[in-house]
Amino acid sequence: MAQAEVLNQESLAKQVLQETFGYQQFRPGQETIIETALEGRDCLVVMPTGGGKSLCYQVPALVMGGLTVVVSPLISLMKDQVDQLLANGVAAACLNSTQSREQQQEVMAGCRSGQVRLLYIAPERLMLDNFLEHLANWNLAMLAVDEAHCISQWGHDFRPEYAALGQLRQRMPQIPFMALTATADDTTRRDIVRLLGLNDPLIQVSSFDRPNIRYMLMEKFKPLDQLMRYVQDQRGKSGIIYCNSRSKVEDTAARLQSRGISAAAYHAGLENDVRAEVQEKFQRDDLQIVVATVAFGMGINKPNVRFVVHFDIPRNIESYYQETGRAGRDSLPAEAMLFYDPADMAWLRRCLEEKPAGPLQDIERHKLNAMGAFAEAQTCRRLVLLNYFGEGRQEPCGNCDICLDPPKQYDGLMDARKALSTIYRVNQRFGMGYVVEVLRGANNQRIREMGHDKLPVYGIGREQSHEHWVSVIRQLIHLGLVTQNIAQHSALQLTEAARPVLRGEVPLQLAVPRIVALKPKAMQKSFGGNYDRKLFAKLRKLRKAIADEENIPPYVVFNDATLIEMAEQSPLTAGEMLSVNGVGTRKLERFGKPFMALIRAHVDGDDE
């Protein structure tokens, strides 16, 4: 591609960003991804929920022309994306099983004529032979695969229908592919590249950090009473509560309703129309809380979810990260609360051991152990999360329960040296349970058969409890001194960073193991910033009225972050309104006048 054409496309991309989507500048990573896509090169985009993944393919789709096909797993997610694009004046459509034959034919005609620029479609429909024949005759410019982790058996949400997408590369070798996901560790990323046949892709891994989310944990004591108090502290904010079973979902929703709280149950056992009604009410701010199994959420693009509660511990960190990521997508403060009982972990482990032995069970065990380590962490929870995804961080976040209410610290160098020495002496071939048994001098047949009762480290930690040593080793993992090798049954292995600690050359503080029993802390009462709270409330009321009249969710009009900026800047002219993030040309034309009129009346005092 000629240099002049590249520069022109980059200029057009910024113009599309500002005029169509109403943002003044790209977020970190977006510009590189968009430029790479415009060069016709494959991309793998790993970006947190709320980080702006969709713009990475939507902007190039509008710059390069032709049709961009977006593979999406859920009808609700497709519809939501299409609604938002249409509100921004973008010719977008979706094909799904809820449409009539006439509606589907109309969409197909729009694709054939070049009128439709972005088409959202489920993987199973895309891979039908007759659809692929149509696709071959359209001006296809790019293929985007959203929720791409679903293609990998290593991923936490494997979907067999995604596996067939690998055949597309052979059919369309010249078309650039873009795979996108919010959650993919290094192994899953390699799987995505291999299974989709991505050719020398740009692999852009953005920070997994969601700094606006406060990570909290509460040990279960009287769980329902604790939950009721927590929800009441949220003062009417939108939230999602996840439970591991349908019966618990229904019971919890009923308990909330009996307390006068606006809540509804959502799980796969409900009729389709019931689920659709719950989701629509939640999207439109007519329902405060959804109590759900994991069946709920992937299709949710609601930016003003202020809290996510896990009433039961998830089976892996990927699920936890993705589900908590549904909070605070507007970048405003949000909270993730995990209710924890060690017995829940024991139950999940028993369920896992009942599954057939093999590599998949090993993967699930490794992921479950990591989730347990997160729940029982004595160090910054954000650091545990980020280190799990391979993003090394050193500084505590200051915005989790551990940072806000730190556990007591002690000089842990001697304990660390004992644990590291034991891992080393058993040749870095054994998991945590076995290492702790050697440390505490357990008298069992396996240790005797291995000859480890003769080691100098045998029993050097017998004065401390089993729980103490588990806590110490988990902290060493969190600090990056020890890793768990899943290929060797989660064997503990030392990293280079362990050497100076093992030799006693550096100080090391560890946390005294404790039972975590924090009272729920309500989020800050407001979002901070110097904006007019009274005007913000009026803008929200106007937004809801317009959304109801237009039959769309309120955030499709403007999200909370945009309204806060309006309440801060009080824009009175079209030019001033366009300087507000989230206000593009089309939205200004469609919604601008009533908002500017309300702001004018507020400034002049005419609405009192």
Regions found by a protein language model. Give the residues of each.
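Short, charged low-complexity linear segments at domain edges
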Residues: 360-389
